[in-house]
Amino acid sequence: MNRARQCLMVMASLALAAGALTGTATAAPPGTAPPAQEQLLTTLDPQRLAASGPRQESMSAALPAGKTCTDLPASKGRKDGARACTEVTRTAGSRTAVPLAAGTCSVQPGYYHFDRHSYCLSDARLTYTLYDPVNGSVKGVGEISLSGSATLDARSGWWNELFTATVTRLEGNVRSLAVKLTASCANSCGMLNADAWGTKVLVLGQSASSHVTFSSYPARGTVTQITPQYALQLYQPGDTPGDWSHNWSLPTKVRCDAESAGYGCVIGQIRVQLNLPLSQWGAAAATYWYGQAALVDHWGAPDNPLRRNKNEAQAIANRYRTCKEGSSIPFYKQDDIPTDSCDEYPFAGTFQGGKDGGSCAEILPKFEGGTWKIYYFLDRKPTGYEPCVRGHVPLKQNTDAGGEVGRFIQDERVLDAEQFTVSTEG
């Protein structure tokens, strides 16, 4: 009998040792300390991320410089011929402020500002100068302020661009200006409205405002890069405008695609950011934060963005390898995390996803005492050199975060292999 009892004790000891090697945790009653196999790795103060908030990329570029001149014949208002030039004015020292009726554009005057879903032009100055054709002396000057704004639609192939032109300066023989603005576009694009306002004759302080409309409907599964183009005519009433105008193109391209359901347009040059704030996405966001902040590859940071993989079969295979039976170390659900599930980072739907789950850092994010605490299994302490992270995340937070990633792909028109960053701030 004593010998049998000793054998049972040895078998029990072996079973406990095996459980420790596989990382199995003992369930903890609510409100008690974590199981003994779990150790605190680090903490994350929600206020630290909430203070800064997410940052979206943007860019700016100057209105392209240029000068266009033409010889004018005599007219009713001028007995002799003249030479007229229209050019972009770069100096801003003597500018008269004008309201930006075409929309507020937070960039220095004379520049375009772009983000993923819009672009605008801020108070660009263009001058019309009248020269004596014989001695080249200046006979008169007119100036306009041109501002514009456009909002792209991620679920439509057309958009309006609103313009406002205001006469800000008239000198000498230039007492008014005729202003005409038209638009066109290149590469699988058409104009629903090419002429902003026809021809408007304006005196000092007067404005003209209206819009042009671009349209693009690429074939299903294709992508097109559109270049909006513009032509501005400034001349004096009574003169023949002729075939000359001041021409320029938008300094970036508008990308329209039909890769997924429907059409949509964005500024593809602006890299987009996926926002999954810790305050909203809880343990899922804490897992992504840890993967980006604590692991050597810091996936999804600006200097190491993720790349979308639209192959759904590959995403399923990636998830199988990281979180399911394909992992060399199984994922064991923990009783002290309600509806525990495996959430992986990098995401399965990226080219960086699909790492062996056995090679991932495995963490248990828990919100305790107003702070996120990141635990690990005693026999699998993360080193920071793992290529991925598996988080123990309540199932609803996991699936809801996955749904948000799907909405992000649609709302931002993220194409296959396109880069994006991830932020858990806010």
Model-derived regions: residue spans:
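Secretory targeting and sorting signals
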Residues: 1-30
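Nuclease and nuclease-like effector domains acting on nucleic acids or nucleotide cofactors
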Residues: 30-339, 348-426
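Short hydrophobic beta-strand that contains or immediately precedes a catalytic carboxylate
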Residues: 342
